[in-house]
Amino acid sequence: PHVLQGIEEYKGKNIVYSLGNFCFGGNKNPSDKDTMIFQQTFTVENGELVEDDVTNIIPCSLSSESGYNNYQPMVLEGSEKERVLQKIEEFSAALNQ
């Protein structure tokens, strides 16, 4: 889908169902511009995975303009960042019941 969805934990691993449209040229003004960067860090020592639970979610908008898509994604800050994090949390809660 072209919208954010939740993150499910399955057998101790993350399933990220949709990041939304990070950079999307198919619509001049999508109604939902929310997107995210999902970072997953893996630590390998001596060829063995020792840690894989370090994650970071960076809320973004697919446009740096609110009225149209200028095809310049931007990292969100402040209340907009918190709004998107809350949205992801709500979607994720429904998946992890």
What label would you give each PLM region?
Residues 31-97:
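A short C-terminal boundary segment appended to hydrolase-like catalytic domains
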Residues 1-38, 44:
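Conserved beta-sheet core of the metallophosphoesterase superfamily
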